Swiss-Prot record:
Keywords: Amino-acid biosynthesis, Arginine biosynthesis, ATP-binding, Ligase, Magnesium, Manganese, Metal-binding, Nucleotide-binding, Pyrimidine biosynthesis, Repeat
Lineage: Archaea, Methanobacteriati, Thermoplasmatota, Thermoplasmata, Thermoplasmatales
Protein name: Carbamoyl phosphate synthase large chain
UniProt cofactor note: Binds 4 Mg(2+) or Mn(2+) ions per subunit.
Pathway: Amino-acid biosynthesis; L-arginine biosynthesis; carbamoyl phosphate from bicarbonate: step 1/1; Pyrimidine metabolism; UMP biosynthesis via de novo pathway; (S)-dihydroorotate from bicarbonate: step 1/3
Domain remark text: The large subunit is composed of 2 ATP-grasp domains that are involved in binding the 2 ATP molecules needed for carbamoyl phosphate synthesis. The N-terminal ATP-grasp domain (referred to as the carboxyphosphate synthetic component) catalyzes the ATP-dependent phosphorylation of hydrogencarbonate to carboxyphosphate and the subsequent nucleophilic attack by ammonia to form a carbamate intermediate.
Residues binding Mn(2+) 2, per UniProt: 296, 298
Source organism of the structure: Thermoplasma acidophilum (strain ATCC 25905 / DSM 1728 / JCM 9062 / NBRC 15155 / AMRC-C165)
Length: 1047
């Protein structure tokens, strides 16, 4: 059947900023969809507010709108672009929910818009839990018992539920948001009351808990002809009760019998066909002793779709887009083999293991995992055996366990970690095996199948009884099991790099196999590779190519922005005539799409695996600038192992001088460049002494970290001692830096060739200095930076380029106070702000950087901003109920959104995505004088003002009337929490003293704002900016290129 000719201009809706439960996988699926539809001759328009994505690049879609993902924006785009079809299945829950709103609002009907792919009715049937329950019931499919708790009948409905524990779920939600397993009625009652207070939902869905059963997933794809295949099935090591996004997942399933496999496959196809799915979807089952229950269906591409695509090589999103265009599976060629069709189910002769990456190294919160997601990213390991795939996944995590799987806790604590779902459970089981714990008991407590624990025992036995100080004689056998050199090092006491060199000298090296969707039955056109210690090597000739290493798993401070840089660098190399190799371990990303680079090696991003690929491929150069801190920290080690210079761009010697804060600060001092007063501390006592010498407040900064890890503004001497102790656990020395109060921070990205440079743009933080650049609200636009400050910055950049011979991209962070410019830090790599400034200027800065690395010169481009571009961070606070909404020098955000405008007020207004008619003000004493003018502005714009008692009195003394609200402990009404819960307040301005009591007082206010999605402004400068933006501000939605033309 030919492609559909009843549609011509298609709007693809993206997923917006990265949040927990919705991350880089939707950049991957959305990019694939756009390219796939354009291949068919359709005019593709993209809407996505996330500038860090590849899909918002002009190479992906014909027209790109980096605008809020709202009904209002979509309607305006429909009018402007004459849209006749919308593809909402590639943008996660955000796009799917928006499609339903567009239908319910009548916009689809009014403009004659078609939803291509799975119909909206099918989406609603799968997403609405009540409708889905009735659908499964009519089909005779088994499902857990279902109950409902209504807003107005909480006590009655909770009392009527016969079986506890239960699982609480909400409809149309993301990453299990609002979900939880509840063990008793009292907790269920409390949870229901909290959820109803924090949202506008009318009822809660409550299901029988299936805790302990196996969780199995099938990735299914179906066309409009009724052809339906399962791309793969996936087995969760963690049992039911742990969200699949939180679980360790193996593909293909390892413990199912053929009868069980076929039973679930048949059920999946029946259900997907019954729903009328046209495209990709994911279905989840609970399984125990031949019995199964249907849990849910995701009627769209998902996190699991990206994982299945990378695990099998089957490009699910690309095929789903072709189906949306009208093709059948029997008509679509498999792009990996280029000879078979998409109707063939993939066949695997290897194993993949996915492990989530949690942010518990950033957040001191409860490490228990459950039905609501907490992980930020994930990694995947590929091997010929489960053991090999598991160990490669562990190596890819880039955390403490990547170099040592031992867990040093007492036995009773170890049993607790084995029995309770948490991020360390698999390492607790490893440790239990080292201590000869009973396998059956560990299986019973954890829910892990004995099969997996026995496989883990093989790893433990290979590591036992190594002689300290000696490389094991049976090294080849250990490597065949899949154990990385870093972990071998921990058990034999020989440095990992020494082991790697030893292997190279004795030719104990891996070969590389191809992922081909067909277990080698057909010729493969694409080199998608993984390593294993066997005999036959399938690596193509890649001599003279250039390798780019990715940034590994998404995590706070190192996420999608770096994948953007990696992909753009690959495309630049291709345009320049160079072949490229990509090495990465993240299954969510565009960079690990098999046809982005000339060869993809899906391997851990560690020195061992990078060196292995370099030696096997014969590549001529290595680019580490787009791998975040990961690449910076390993660059020198890679060159030392190889015994030669191979890193392109800034030299590893310069990188080391810049990354060591002590050395860097002294170099800057020698250059005569201003920096905040500082001292170098060698231990905890020295830290306290030098901090007191500088005078509080101060900031402690450690070396070789990203995202300001462990950094914090410290006002209190007792707290200083505690923080110093924690930092010296990860750092040999600490830079004690005076905190510059009332300064403005700026980010300066620039490209240089070692002598000349071009500044990409100067981005100004709206908040005062002290908020991490990854968390700050930032703006780029005309007239933002005074001319005299620009000239001083240019002078500093020139000095840096010449001193460190910077080649490629670099990022300089500065603070400006009283006309003076102070250097905070320099990063000799691409930064988080590079995608943002690239979209704001319309210039491919990554390409210019790669040209410099290859040997070209850079011309100084003086950028003249034409419009305003606002960068707003997105935080994960809603997922961590015990985490306060307070930010500072250590980064906490998961993603970002960009809001362009012809004026700054327009950009700010877009970022609110709601009208503001009432504001609650509650600020600390030192901010009260500054809040007066802000309150007056709000009042003049017709905004109703509320305030807490102290703030209300202060404003009244300055002639500004407010209505006073009270805390619960005040025992007076109206109460703050009630007013926020009732929807009477549209925005909250809250600053707090950084003392335990003050933070605790504001905690509930901040939490309920986060849960209800109410704008929470925690900085006076930012409050002023938003106050000035309110009122009659004209808002329009434009293609990103149009903002570059507006003067």
């Amino acid at each position: 059947m030919p492609r559909r000719d009843d549609i011509h201009r298609i709007l693809v809706i993206g997923s917006g900023p990265v949040v927990i439960g919705q991350a880089a996988e939707f950049d991957y699926s959305g990019s694939q969809a756009c390219l796939s539809l354009r291949e068919e001759g359709y005019y593709v328009v993209l809407l996505n507010s996330n500038p860090a994505t590849i899909q918002t690049d002009h190479r992906i879609a014909d027209r790109v709108y980096i605008e809020p993902i709202t009904v209002e924006a979509v309607e305006r785009i429909i009018e402007k672009e004459k849209i006749d079809a919308i593809e909402p299945h590639m943008g996660g829950q955000t796009a799917l929910n928006l499609a339903v709103k567009l239908k319910n609002s009548g916009i689809l009907q009014r403009y004659g818009i078609k939803i291509i792919g799975t119909p909206v009715e099918s989406i609603e049937l799968a997403e609405d839990r009540e409708k889905f329950y009735e659908f499964l019931k009519a089909m005779g499919e088994p499902q857990p018992a279902r109950y409902r708790i209504r807003r107005d009948h909480i006590d009655e409905d909770v009392a009527s539920i016969p079986d506890i524990p239960v699982i609480v779920r909400t409809s149309f939600s993301l990453g299990g948001t609002g979900g939880s397993i509840v063990q008793n009625r009292q907790d269920l009652l409390a949870m229901a009351e909290n959820l109803f207070r924090a949202s506008d939902i009318d009822y809660l869905e409550v299901n029988e808990s299936l805790e302990g059963m196996k969780e199995i997933e099938y990735e299914v794809i179906r066309d409009s002809f009724g052809n339906c295949i399962t791309v793969c099935n996936m087995e969760n090591l963690d049992p039911m009760g742990v969200h699949t996004g939180e679980s360790i997942v193996v593909t293909p399933s390892q413990t199912l019998s053929d009868i069980e496999y076929q039973m679930l496959r048949d059920s999946a196809i029946r259900i997907i066909s019954g729903l009328g799915i046209e495209g990709a979807c994911n279905i989840q089952f609970a399984l125990s002793e031949g019995r199964y229950y249907v849990i849910e269906v995701n009627p769209r591409t998902s996190r699991s779709s990206a994982l299945a695509s990378k695990a099998t090589g089957y490009p699910i999103a690309r095929i789903a887009a072709k189906i949306a265009a009208g093709y059948g599976l029997h008509e679509i060629k498999n792009p990996i083999t280029k000879s078979t069709f998409a109707a063939y189910e993939p066949s695997l002769d290897y194993v993949t293991v996915k492990i989530p990456r949690w942010p518990f190294d950033k957040f001191s919160v409860d490490r228990t995992i459950g039905v609501q997601m907490k992980s930020i990213g994930e990694v995947m390991g590929i091997g010929r055996t489960f053991e090999e795939a598991l160990m490669k996944a562990i190596a890819s995590l880039d955390n403490a366990f990547s170099s040592n799987i031992r867990l040093h806790v007492p036995d009773d604590e170890l049993w607790r970690l084995i029995g309770k779902p948490n991020d360390r459970r698999i390492f607790a089981i490893f440790e239990g095996l080292f201590r000869n714990f009973d396998v059956k008991r560990m299986s019973r407590l954890s829910g892990y199948d004995e099969y997996f624990i026995e496989k883990m025992r093989n790893i433990v036995e290979a590591l036992r009884n190594m002689d300290m100080g000696r490389i094991p004689e049976n090294l080849l056998r250990i490597k065949r099991i899949g154990i990385p050199d870093e972990i071998i090092s921990a058990f034999c006491g020989v440095p990992a790099d020494t082991i790697t060199k030893y292997r190279i000298d004795r030719n104990i090296m891996p070969v590389y196999k191809r992922i081909d969707t067909c277990s080698g039955e057909f010729e493969v056109a694409v080199p998608y590779m993984y390593s294993t210690y066997e005999d036959e090597d399938e690596t193509p000739d890649l001599s003279g190519s250039i390798m780019i290493i990715g940034s590994g798993p998404n995590r706070i401070a190192q996420g999608l922005e770096f994948d953007y840089g990696s992909v753009k660098a690959i495309l630049a190399l291709r345009d320049m005539g160079y072949r490229s190799i990509m090495l990465n371990s993240n299954p969510e990303t565009v960079s690990t799409d098999f046809d982005i680079s000339d060869a993809l090696f899906f391997e851990p991003v560690t020195p061992e695996y990078v060196v292995n690929v370099i030696r096997r491929s014969g590549c001529a150069g290595l680019i580490v600038q787009f791998s975040g801190q990961t690449g910076q920290n390993m660059a020198r080690r890679i060159e030392e192992i190889l015994g030669k210079h191979i890193v392109l761009g800034t030299s590893t010697e310069s990188i080391d001088r810049i990354e060591d804060r002590t050395v860097f600060s002294r170099v800057i001092e020698g250059l005569g460049i201003k920096q905040p007063p500082f001292a170098i501390a060698e231990n905890e006592n020295d830290t306290v002494r030098k901090a007191m010498g500088l005078g509080l407040p101060i900031i402690l900064r450690s070396s070789h970290v990203i995202g300001g890890r462990s950094m914090e503004i410290i006002y209190d001497v007792d707290y200083l001692a505690d923080r110093a102790r924690e930092i010296f656990a990860i750092s040999k020395n600490v830079l004690v830096s005076k905190y510059l109060e009332n300064a403005v921070e700026m980010d300066v990205d620039f490209v240089s060739d070692g002598t000349s440079y071009s500044i990409c743009g100067i981005i100004v933080h709206i908040e005062e200095a002290g908020v991490h650049s990854g968390d700050a609200t930032m703006v780029y636009g005309p007239g933002i930076v005074p001319v005299d400050i620009e000239k001083k910055i240019e002078g500093i950049v020139g000095s840096m380029v010449r001193e460190f011979r910077l080649i490629g991209l670099s990022n300089l962070q500065i603070a400006v106070r009283d006309g003076d410019v102070y250097v905070i830090e320099l990063n000799a790599r691409s930064s988080r702000s590079v995608p943002f400034i690239s979209k704001a200027t319309g210039i491919d800065w990554v390409r210019l950087a790669v040209e410099c690395m290859i040997g070209s010169r850079i011309e100084n481009k003086r950028m003249e901003a034409k419009s305003y571009f606002l960068k707003v961070s997105v935080f994960p606070f809603s997922k961590f109920s015990d985490m306060d909404v307070v930010y500072g020098p250590e980064m906490k955000s998961t993603g970002e959104a960009m809001y362009p405008g012809r004026t700054l007020a327009e950009a700010l207004r877009k970022s609110l995505q709601r009208s503001i008619s009432s504001v609650l003000i509650t600020v600390r004493d030192e901010d009260k004088p500054r809040i007066v003018d802000i309150a007056r502005i709000l009042l003049e714009k017709g905004v109703k003002l509320y305030a807490t008692a102290g703030t209300s009195k202060f404003l009244a003394d300055h002639g500004i009337p407010t209505e006073t609200l009270y805390r619960v402990r005040d025992r007076r009404e109206p109460r703050i929490l009630d007013m926020i819960s009732s929807g009477s307040i549209d925005m909250v301005i809250n600053t707090t003293e950084m003392t335990a009591g003050a933070v605790r007082d504001g905690f509930k206010i901040r939490r309920i704002c986060i849960m209800r999605g109410i704008p929470l402004i925690m900085n006076i400068n930012l409050a002023r900016a938003y106050a000035e933006a309110l009122g009659q501000v004209e808002v329009d939605y434009r293609e990103i290129g149009d903002y570059l033309q507006v003067s």
